[in-house]
Amino acid sequence: MAVIDFHSHILPGIDDGARNIDSALAMLEQIQTQQIDIMAATPHFYAAKDRIDTFLKKRETARDVFIHAVREHEMNAVPQILLGSEVAFFDGISRAKEIEALTLEGTRLLLLEMPFVPWTDQNLLEVERLIKER
């Protein structure tokens, strides 16, 4: 049985998680004590702040920096890192081009952060469309 961490902010400098590579490596050392086999790196995506293609480039760069540092520090027992995103709900999400690129690598799973205000019928309709039509 694999132990999977489905949600982490370990990638350095991309969101409110690991501020830099040193904090990312410190987080990884802590994770290693928990015997995690697979880890989803899921930085925040805010449609009002970033375009999907811009976000994907930043995420890939952060992952590359992280992997390089892990190798440079010769860390052992590193979990497999899968790229994903924590997508803040936005109006029109069900019609957003390239939304699939934000899913967990190798899956159709999308980590969706719902609004912190009462949900409207329109919010629920968007999620339903996202599930059924994508």
Question: Could you say what each language-model-derived stretch is?
Answer:
Residues 1-78, 129:
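An N-terminally biased module of ancient metal coordination in phosphate/nucleic-acid-related enzymes
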